[in-house]
Amino acid sequence: MGHHGQMHAQHGVTMPADSPIGQPDRSEQRYFPATAFRTRRSTLSDAQRQTWDRRWPELGLSVGPAEDPDRPGPPLDTDAWFGRKAPVVLEIGCGNGTSTLAMAKEEPGVDVIAVEVYRRGLAQLLCAIDRDNVTNIRLIRGNALDVLQRLIAPASLTGVRVFFPDPWPKARHHKRRFLQPGTVGLIADRLLPGGVLHVATDHAGYAEHIADVGAGEPRLRPANPDSPLPISVARPTTKYETKAQDAGSAVTEFIWLRR
């Protein structure tokens, strides 16, 4: 386990009470990232396309930009989607789903919603779900900020995972980093009391930024390493992480609890 964020006084974005699912105040948009993902072409293999066509209608959901972002509509009915009532974890930026699949298998009593903008990564995960007959994962293709704002109800998530988000290392691109005060505030709003925000990064500069942003959100507190948690925080080591460590990059992890 890596380092936890240290607490100091800052303030995150506030959520107006009159919004159906806590839409952030328009005046606070500077607290949110600009485009937080890169444009990428994604081509599926024939096998991936066949699995996609067969399983996506059941397990997947595509989310585009809202026509009227001030009226996000009703939140997602996760009990109906999964066919049961269970703790729900939202994983933001699941990539090809290596960690998603492994962690879902280890906790069959926890339902996982994996969000990713790139179709190829989702297709790889969907094929693995189909191959291994995993029943506790659902997929959303779209911008995670749209998902949090429009589909997730306040105080509905047991956990949120953000593993190795794009660090956007150039200073002029820092505004594109996903974990900004507004985003972390929105995540805190969506977590149940006692819920977990679990973040990992291998970029030292982004780690400092994340520590500051997390410390500035008053609804979050660093988890005590000895305290029991409602979900597992044991991640598998991915090929990407191994490559980063071989290159000399240290992985920093943050685990916060919703107050």
Curated annotation (Swiss-Prot):
Protein's UniProt keywords contain Glycoprotein: no
Enzyme class: transferase
Residues forming coiled coils: none
A molecular function GO annotation: tRNA (guanine(46)-N7)-methyltransferase activity
UniProt xrefs under SUPFAM superfamilies: S-adenosyl-L-methionine-dependent methyltransferases
Pathway(s) annotated for this protein in UniProt: tRNA modification; N(7)-methylguanine-tRNA biosynthesis
Chain residue ranges for the region called Disordered: 1-73
Active site: 166
Sequence positions that bind substrate: 170, 202, 238-241
Family membership noted in the UniProt record: Belongs to the class I-like SAM-binding methyltransferase superfamily. TrmB family.
Task performed by this protein: Catalyzes the formation of N(7)-methylguanine at position 46 (m7G46) in tRNA.
Name of the featured protein: tRNA (guanine-N(7)-)-methyltransferase
Source organism (scientific name): Mycolicibacterium paratuberculosis (strain ATCC BAA-968 / K-10) (Mycobacterium paratuberculosis)
